[in-house]
C-alpha cells in the first residue's frame, strides 16, 4: 500500500477569527523587530559620522589635489607627475589671524596620525570679505569658499554664517565647523574624517603639471587622467597659488607666522591644456607654490521609488505591503 505524507498547516484547526488575529499579530511583531533593527543600525552609522556632508547641486561631490610646483625665482621651469595612490589627503581650512579657536583646531590637525607613505595637503583660506585685521585673504579665495561650501556651512551653524572660522573640509566632502566635537574629542572627529578618505576610487588617476617662466611670463600646462570615471562625472580643475608662510606679528591670535596661505585661484576650462597668467604675489618672501586640484561632481539620478525611501520608511512600506497581502488572503478564505 502506497502512503502519502501530507503537510498539514496547524492554523487550519484554528477558528478563522483567531487565525486572522494571529496573522495580524505576526505582521505587528515583524514590523516592530524590523523597526528596532533599522533604528539601531541608523544610530550606529550616525555615531561613526563625525562631520556634515558637503551639499552640492549634484548628489555627490569632492575635491582632490594636488600636484605641486615651487614657483622659485631661481627656477625657470618645473614638471611633476602624480599617480592616484600618491595624491595626498586634502584639508581645506577657513581661518583668520584674529581667530584663537583656529589655533586650537589647527594644532589638532597637525597632530593627526598619517599612515606611512601617505601625506596631507593643507590649504588655508583667510577671511577677506568685511575683514580689517587679516591681510592674507582675497576676494577670489573668499568667493571660492562661499560658492563651494557656503550652503553647507550656513546649515551647520546657529549663526547661519557661510564662512565661519574655524572650519575644516576633508577631501572636499566633509565639513567640521567650529570647535564643537561630535565624538569624545576633536582629535577623534578629525581622525575619523581623515581615515575615511575620498569616496571615489582614485587609484587609477594620474596628473602632470608643468610650469615655465620665460622673461617673466608664467606659462602652465596640465593633464588630468580620470579614465576610471563614467561620463556621469564632471571634473572642474583649477590652480591654487599658495604661500608657504607669511609673517604677521599683529595677528590677534598671537601666532605671528601663518602657513599654507591660499593667495590666488585660477579656474581651468578643461582637464588638459595650457595657460599664461599673472598671479597674486606672496605677502612676503619668495615661497609660493602652484597646486593643481580639481572638484568632481557625480550626477546620481534617483534609483526608482524604493531607492528614494529612507531605510526606516522602506521598512514600514514593506511591512504595510505584507499586512495588505495578509488581509487580501484572509478575505479570500
Where are these regions (language model features)?
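Secretory targeting signatures
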Residues: 1-55, 89-91, 99, 306-333
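N-terminal "domain-start" segment that seeds a small globular fold
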Residues: 44-81
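Local sequence-structure signature of Cys/Sec-based thiol-disulfide redox active-site neighborhoods
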Residues: 78-128
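Short, conserved sequence motifs used for protein processing/export or organelle targeting and
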Residues: 134-174, 178-308
Amino acid at each position: 500500500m502506497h502512503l502519502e505524507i501530507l503537510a498539514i498547516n496547524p492554523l487550519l484547526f484554528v477558528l478563522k477569527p483567531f487565525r486572522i488575529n494571529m496573522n495580524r499579530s505576526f505582521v505587528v511583531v515583524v514590523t516592530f523587530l524590523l523597526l528596532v533593527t533599522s533604528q539601531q543600525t541608523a544610530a550606529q552609522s550616525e555615531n561613526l559620522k563625525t562631520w556634515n556632508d558637503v551639499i552640492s547641486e549634484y548628489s555627490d561631490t569632492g575635491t582632490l589635489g594636488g600636484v605641486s610646483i615651487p614657483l622659485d625665482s631661481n627656477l625657470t621651469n618645473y614638471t611633476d607627475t602624480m599617480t592616484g595612490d600618491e595624491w595626498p589627503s586634502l584639508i581645506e581650512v577657513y581661518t583668520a589671524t584674529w581667530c584663537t579657536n583656529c589655533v586650537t583646531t589647527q594644532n589638532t590637525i597637525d597632530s593627526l596620525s598619517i599612515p606611512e607613505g601617505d601625506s596631507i595637503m593643507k590649504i588655508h583660506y583667510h577671511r577677506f570679505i568685511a575683514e580689517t585685521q587679516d591681510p592674507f585673504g582675497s576676494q577670489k579665495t573668499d568667493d571660492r569658499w562661499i560658492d563651494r561650501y557656503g550652503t553647507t556651512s550656513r546649515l551647520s551653524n546657529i549663526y547661519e554664517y557661510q564662512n565661519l572660522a574655524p572650519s575644516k573640509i576633508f577631501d572636499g566632502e566633509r565639513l567640521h565647523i567650529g570647535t564643537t566635537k561630535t565624538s569624545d574629542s576633536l582629535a577623534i572627529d578629525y581622525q575619523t574624517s581623515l581615515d575615511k578618505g575620498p569616496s571615489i576610487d582614485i587609484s587609477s588617476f594620474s596628473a602632470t603639471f608643468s610650469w615655465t617662466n620665460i622673461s617673466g611670463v608664467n606659462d602652465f600646462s596640465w593633464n588630468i587622467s580620470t579614465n576610471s570615471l563614467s561620463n556621469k562625472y564632471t571634473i572642474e580643475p583649477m590652480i591654487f597659488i599658495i604661500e608657504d608662510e607669511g609673517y604677521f606679528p599683529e595677528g590677534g591670535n598671537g601666532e605671528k607666522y601663518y602657513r599654507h596661505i591660499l593667495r590666488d585661484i585660477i579656474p581651468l576650462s578643461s582637464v588638459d591644456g595650457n595657460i599664461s597668467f599673472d598671479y597674486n604675489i606672496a605677502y612676503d618672501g619668495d615661497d609660493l607654490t602652484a597646486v593643481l586640484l580639481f572638484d568632481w561632481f557625480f550626477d546620481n539620478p534617483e534609483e526608482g521609488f524604493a531607492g528614494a525611501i529612507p531605510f526606516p520608511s522602506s521598512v514600514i512600506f514593506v511591512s504595510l505591503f505584507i499586512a495588505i497581502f495578509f488581509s487580501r488572503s484572509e478575505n479570500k478564505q
